[in-house]
A protein has these predicted regions:
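Short, Lys/Arg- and Gly-enriched loop/turn segments at beta-strand edges
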Residues: 75-86, 247-249, 307-311
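Conserved PDZ fold ligand-binding element
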Residues: 60-81, 291-293, 298-299
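Serine endopeptidase catalytic core focused on the charge-relay Asp
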Residues: 115-280, 284, 293-294, 302, ...
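PDZ-domain C-terminal substructure recognizer with occasional recognition of PDZ-binding tails
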Residues: 35, 84-123
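PDZ/PDZ-like groove recognition
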Residues: 31-65, 267
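A short glycine-leucine-enriched loop at secondary-structure breakpoints
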Residues: 56-68, 89-91, 281-285, 290
């Protein structure tokens, strides 16, 4: 009987041991490359409405900006082309049944097809893809999982996070910089090379975009992943592109560390004169730039502070690596 009690205690102690369920590598390939990014939505996004002959479509009270149209008369649609084809096939009916997704719940509505001259209109503004520029944060050389951006991709009209069906990262060439100033976030201006694809996107989250790097891995020195408690106030650097495809390292100063928030763990200010002269501070397109300290990769740039664009936020690299593995 005594032996059984001891065994029970031993089993309980085993269950209490912490288990690391994430399998990311301890050494990863740092990014810094500017990327072209294109994501396609799960369904067709409704982004707004317009009047036809002075009034809105009668289906509009049910349909909201930010909804995803997923079916027309039970036919699945994921692109504007598929949506148009499904509607055109039912023009003679004068209306269609629309299946919508909102907050992961399915809703239905009837949508009148209104004739205006020689064409039929729905009164809906829609889109199914978004393209932009961001920065690669890392590639895990063992799994080929990549992380980039450090924050979510949102649809600009609704400000909603895009529910991604699939997407791509591809070659991007910086042609100039629109400088930041107080009250205004500048941006990287870029040329897109859609035919030079680097990887496939399968996830869009509030801590970055993730997927599989399909191309040949960059020939770079792998950097050790820093634990959160290794990140210190003081000097660090970011890797990013300001011209063409040339990755350079620029000095920053980490001013505050917050371990208890998810997306703004690292507060920093730019101290590099060259970077400040060329950009005025943090600019759009810089999101995802890896942050390096003491030879280790510690995080990624995520946000600019508009009131003082020489300052910004970053998140811990471990947060991105864990999200990439989920």
């Amino acid at each position: 009987m005594i032996i059984l009690k001891k065994l029970k205690i031993l089993l309980i102690s085993w269950l209490l041991l912490p288990i690391n369920v994430f399998a990311y590598s301890n050494y990863i390939i740092p990014g810094g490359e500017t990327l072209g990014i294109e994501v396609n939505s799960k369904g067709v996004m409704v982004i707004g409405f317009y009047q036809i002959n002075g009034k809105f479509n009668k289906g509009v009270p049910v349909i909201k900006a930010g909804d995803y149209i997923v079916k027309i008369n039970d036919v699945e649609v994921n692109t504007i082309e598929e949506l148009t084809k499904a509607i055109e096939a039912n023009v003679s009916l004068g209306e269609v049944n629309v299946e919508l997704r909102r907050d992961k719940k399915v809703r239905t509505s009837k949508l009148e097809l209104v004739k205006d001259g020689d064409i039929y209109k729905t009164g809906l503004y829609v889109k199914n893809s978004i393209t932009g520029t961001g920065t690669l944060t890392y590639i895990d050389p063992e799994t080929k999982i990549f992380g980039a951006l450090g924050h979510e991709i949102v649809e600009s009209n609704t400000n909603n996070i895009v529910e991604v069906k699939d997407g791509s990262i591809f070659r991007n060439y910086i042609t100039g910089i629109d400088k930041s100033k107080v009250g205004y976030a500048g941006s990287k201006n870029a040329k897109f090379y859609y035919n030079t694809k680097y990887g496939s996107i399968n996830k869009n989250t509030n801590v970055g975009i993730y997927g599989i790097y399909d191309s040949i891995l960059p020939n770079k020195e792998r950097l050790e992943v820093a634990r959160n408690d290794e990140v210190k106030i003081g000097k660090a650097s970011i890797a990013t592109v300001l011209s063409k495809e040339d990755i350079k390292y620029y000095d920053i100063e980490i001013t505050k560390i917050d371990e208890y928030t998810k997306v703004k763990n690292i507060s920093f200010k730019i101290t590099d004169k060259e970077l400040l002269d060329k950009t005025g501070g943090v600019v759009q397109g810089m999101s995802g730039s890896p942050i390096i300290q003491n030879g280790k990769i510690i995080g990624a740039v995520t946000h600019v502070i508009i009131d003082n664009p020489t300052t910004g936020y970053g998140l811990f690299i471990t947060t991105m690596l864990e999200e990439g593995e989920k």
